[in-house]
Design a protein with these regions (language model features):
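Glycine-/small-residue-enriched transmembrane alpha-helix faces in small-molecule transporters
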Residues: 1-45, 151-178, 202, 268, ...
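Hydrophobic alpha-helical transmembrane segments of multi-pass integral membrane proteins
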Residues: 12-17, 43-58, 79, 131-140, ...
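Specific transmembrane alpha-helical segments of multi-pass solute transporters/efflux pumps
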Residues: 24, 28-29, 57-108, 144, ...
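Hydrophobic/small/kink-forming positions within alpha-helical transmembrane segments
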Residues: 26, 30, 81-86, 90, ...
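Membrane-interface helix termini and inter-helical loops of multi-pass transporters
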Residues: 31-41, 97, 145-155, 207-223, ...
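Hydrophobic/aromatic residues within transmembrane alpha-helices
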Residues: 35, 44, 48, 95, ...
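C-terminal transmembrane-helix exit sites in multi-pass transporters
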Residues: 55-63, 111-136, 264-283
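Hydrophobic transmembrane alpha-helices of multi-pass small-molecule transport proteins
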Residues: 56, 127-147, 260, 280-299
Length: 311
């Protein structure tokens, strides 16, 4: 009974961490939308990741001391973050540039399927009809909350690249937890954020060398500084930390269910700034919530059931 209560408490805490993570993450969308009016996409992502990394390193130094930073597995964390979060985020951007926002959003909405497939293949997770029904509701709810018009969907190489992006992000989240079991969530987040920052810096300098668009850096205004801190510290640093904590508690499959609810969170944030309420997104969020609960619920066992083993 005690173990059951501990499991339920861990699941509740994990789901709460995922919700907080997605809430913080969603603040990045309106901030980025405003910054991209003057900033180049490559320069903005590179600076955002650098500021987020410095924030996490500072937080680590404050919590455990500067000396402990030398003991972290920086090289291993770099490569997990480089491939999982760095390449994954860039591939999603490439997918949108090759198709449209609808197709990229559909590819991102498949992340729960990719995440569950990883758990089945690598962790031996057993699927039940109840869990699969929950996954179906989560995907349906996310598509509804996103307001996607399927008539705009384009199947092709761009969509397949988007699927790869979702798979890499799911793999990176799982690898951050499973590959660094000896570390606390904050340390896991910090070492892998280094890899994500390194990849985006590599892309930025490559774009500079080849004189590609998206590298312009304007003279920052006071408003830019505020938005950059929101985008880097809140939508990346705190969000990624809470996200890794949640993944460690409920697994990447269930955690990914929360991530695709971001459009609903963004709507709530924009509502504060005077934008309208969308019942379609609200209904989608409700469907998604039912799916999350269903996927984690366990059927009641018959307490009077007897063992089938021979005496």
């Amino acid at each position: 009974m005690l173990n059951k209560l501990k499991t339920q408490s861990s699941a509740a805490s994990g789901n709460l961490n995922c919700m907080v993570a997605v809430g913080f993450f969603s603040f990045g969308f309106p901030a980025a939308n405003s910054l991209l009016e003057t900033w180049g996409v490559f320069s903005l992502i590179a600076l955002r990741n650098l500021l987020g990394l410095l924030f996490l390193i500072g937080l680590m130094a404050f919590k455990v001391g500067v000396g402990s930073l030398n003991q972290l597995p920086w090289i291993k964390g770099f490569w997990v973050g480089f491939f999982g979060f760095g390449i994954g985020s860039m591939l999603l951007l490439l997918s949108q540039s090759m198709t449209n926002a609808v197709t990229a959003a559909l590819a991102a909405a498949t992340m729960p399927i990719c995440a569950v497939a990883l758990e089945v293949a690598l962790d031996g997770k057993r699927l039940t009809l109840r869990f699969l029904a929950g996954v179906a509701l989560v995907v349906l709810g996310s598509l509804t909350a996103s307001g996607i018009q399927f008539s705009d969907f384009q199947f092709g190489l761009g969509f397949l690249i988007g699927l790869c992006a979702s798979s890499l992000f799911a793999w990176g989240s799982r690898a951050t937890v499973k590959g660094f079991l000896e570390l606390k969530p904050l340390a896991r987040t910090t070492v892998t954020t280094l890899g994500m920052t390194g990849f985006c810096a590599f892309v930025f300098f490559g774009a500079l060398i080849f004189k590609m668009p998206g590298t312009n850096i304007p003279t920052p205004t006071d408003n830019d500084f505020i938005l950059l801190l929101i985008y880097a510290w809140c939508a990346l640093g705190l969000s990624q930390w809470m996200w890794i904590r949640g993944v460690g508690q409920v697994g990447i499959g269930v955690a990914s269910f929360h991530l695709i609810a971001a459009p609903f969170y963004v709507m709530l944030i924009m509502l504060v700034f005077g934008y309208g309420w969308s019942w379609l997104q609200a209904i989608g969020a409700c469907i998604l919530a039912v799916g999350v609960i269903m996927a984690q619920s366990q059927p009641k066992r018959d307490s009077t059931a007897k063992s089938t083993h021979s005496p």
